[in-house]
Amino acid sequence: MVNLPRDRMDQVVKRFEMLEAQMSAGPAPDAYVKMASEYAELQDMVAKVRQLRSAEHEQADLEAMLADKGTDAEMRALAEADLPDVEERIEALQKDIQILLLPKDAADDKNAILEIRAGTGGDEAALFAGDLFRMYERYAAERGWRFETVSASDGDAGGFKEIIATVSGKGVFAHLKFESGVHRVQRVPATEASGRIHTSAATVAVLPEAEEVDIEIRAEDIRIDTMRASGSGGQHVNTTDSAVRITHLPTGIMVVQAEKSQHQNRAKAMQILRARLYDLERSKADEERSESRKSQVGSGDRSERIRTYNFPQGRVTDHRINLTLYKLDRVMMGELDEIVDALIADHQSKLLADIGLDG
């Protein structure tokens, strides 16, 4: 039997019913929008709690029927057949409610900025960075998310030295946040005549996209420089001074955008700067909450090797949860759900243990 905080569940249902009544009374538009947002957040939890209560009543009735010596044989047989199904349903609902009761990461519903950089391994690392980029692009397409390249620095032999994209849609950061870290590849490069396996790496950073309300950037804290865009590898060369470099003076964080429109460059550079500053704030808060930091999948450190992609064996291994899948080709085609779901489940189970709800 799972240990659930019944008082808290009752409070959630009461709050939901109160909001329902207030919204029916026709409040002012601003108040209605706020209420509707909270109402939507509570809806899943309340539905599960009501289903659980109904199933528990059903269980009690069946147990009473079985305990009653006056119950005829046919009814007893029906009750005995139904009871295991009801108990199974109750257990599943309890687990669902446990997850819904977990502390919510405020950034989970946000869009994300995805940054991929080639690491050790030269040209092969840049090619792998390109492979990872396409993997995430396909994953985003599978989930119906919008995926847009913000900037790219091409590798000398293909792929990317660095590429940045925005990913927009429902649950983007919640699903991508565990991708941050070092991704290692083991394969035979196309240029390797002897067939020797090379190891190279790329670093992935997933940042929650920050709104202006999330992070304040004061005008006096930034320096904006414009410069001539030279393009990468001779591409996108622009003879006007359109490239923009924004430096955040207090932290030294620098963002450069070098597409053709100076106005767009400034807006995109500010978008990335805001995300990096917001991420910095979140990291500091995580460090202060050292106990909760232990519950994260891995350390969250972007220098931590999190996953290995072994092409000769067709294997992908996530080292944080010791998960190995022998379907590398499908993973590279964007089939990431099995890995992502396992990472989320592992994170949730550790959170449940932390707050004493692991039953």
Swiss-Prot record:
Q: Which GO terms describe its cellular component?
A: cytoplasm
Keyword list, A-Z: Cytoplasm, Methylation, Protein biosynthesis
Q: Composition bias, kind Basic and acidic residues: at what positions?
A: 283-294
Spell out the subcellular localization from the entry.
Cytoplasm
Q: Which residues carry this modification: N5-methylglutamine?
A: 235
One MF annotation (Gene Ontology) recorded for this entry: translation release factor activity, codon specific
Region ranges (Disordered): 283-309
Q: How is it modified after translation?
A: Methylated by PrmC. Methylation increases the termination efficiency of RF1.
Coiled coil where?
none
Q: Which Pfam families match?
A: PCRF (PF03462), RF-1 (PF00472)
Q: Which family does it belong to?
A: Belongs to the prokaryotic/mitochondrial release factor family.
Per the entry, what this protein does is: Peptide chain release factor 1 directs the termination of translation in response to the peptide chain termination codons UAG and UAA.
Q: Which PANTHER family match?
A: LD18447P (PTHR43804:SF7)
The identity of this protein, by name, is Peptide chain release factor 1
